[in-house]
A protein has these predicted regions:
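Nucleotide phosphate-binding/pyrophosphate-handling subdomain across enzymes
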Residues: 5-18, 22-23, 36, 83-195
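Flexible active-site lid/hinge loop adjacent to a nucleotide/diphosphate
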Residues: 1-55
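Short, surface-exposed connector motifs at secondary-structure boundaries
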Residues: 43-51, 161, 165-170, 192-195, ...
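C-terminal helical cap/extension that packs against the catalytic core
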Residues: 52, 56-75, 94, 140, ...
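Short, charged, surface-exposed secondary-structure boundary motifs
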Residues: 26-32, 84-85, 205-210
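Short, active-site-adjacent cap segments at secondary-structure transitions
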Residues: 5-7, 59-60, 258-260
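Active-site-proximal loop/hinge segments that shape catalytic or ion-binding/gating pockets
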Residues: 255
């Protein structure tokens, strides 16, 4: 969903509103600046309803302003350094954990909910997030990153994985939706790639692999990278497995619709 003012769920008056963080997403509908998107996301803030946010910088200032106008108590996300969270891959999950704990505290302050530390720990321990930095086998990682901010996180995590597991090469299986910033996304991952296989999901908004390859060739004029086009995610993954050595890592990414076909 879009999230924010234009999201269908915004008809509901919640116990607490949460704006996790702000990135350049759905720019055709929400605007092409962080400030404009922050304004749209802040559209979920209701009169007298507490709001939690992990936003920073200018985005946070806009959310603060709107929260004040609507008399909505604002909770900027606190860091809970003593609450370790290692049930999901990725350092960014620590921030997600902090958002959850801040939200629970906001709920407890304004509503008579009964929830104790033991229940919170149990809930966090059972958390699952399929398709986000998920290893579906020893050398196949799937990640549903589909915008520049998501790929920034993925890129950071892959560097950590490379050092920890002594990865030789990354083989990417990539499919991206037409409405995404394809050039920026591909440009971000070029330094990591040894081989890239372009494919597409069955979603009607999926970019043609040929178009992705065309854009890729336009921006990559320095690094020798093997490229391939396959007409389905499963065929692309099968080919990647065929060419991968034991110290290589296959990364399937670019679209939630793509990832669903391989997990």
């Amino acid at each position: 969903g879009l999230g924010g003012r234009l999201d269908a769920t915004n008809v509901v008056v919640p116990l607490v509103s949460v704006v996790t963080n702000i990135g350049l997403e759905h720019t055709d509908l929400l605007g092409n600046t962080i400030e404009r998107i922050a304004f749209e996301k802040a559209g979920i803030i209701k009169n007298n309803v507490p709001v939690v946010t992990g936003a920073k910088g200018n985005a946070l200032q806009i959310i603060k302003k709107i929260a004040k106008e609507r008399n909505a108590p604002l909770f900027a996300v606190e860091r809970y350094a003593d609450a370790k969270f290692d049930y999901l891959n990725g350092d960014f999950q620590q921030q997600n954990k902090d958002i959850v704990l801040t939200t629970i505290n906001a709920l407890k302050k304004f509503h008579p909910i009964k929830i104790n530390q033991k229940q919170i720990k149990k809930g966090i321990k059972k958390t699952q997030w399929q398709g986000r930095l998920q290893f579906i086998s020893k050398n196949v990682l799937v990640d549903c990153a589909h915008n520049p901010s998501g790929f920034e996180v993925l890129k950071k995590e892959l560097k950590i994985i490379k050092n920890r597991r002594k990865i030789n090469n990354f083989i990417f299986v990539v499919g991206i939706q037409k409405d995404k910033n394809i050039m920026e996304i591909l440009n971000m991952i070029i330094p990591l790639i040894s081989t890239i296989i372009f494919t597409k999901s069955k979603n009607e908004n999926a970019s043609a692999p040929q178009e992705l390859l065309k854009i890729f060739n336009k921006i990559n004029n320095e690094k020798p990278i093997e490229t391939k086009i396959m007409d389905s995610p499963k065929k692309a993954l099968s080919y990647a497995r065929k060419i991968a050595d034991k110290n290589d890592l296959i990364v399937v990414t670019g679209s939630i619709y793509l990832v669903e076909y391989v997990i």
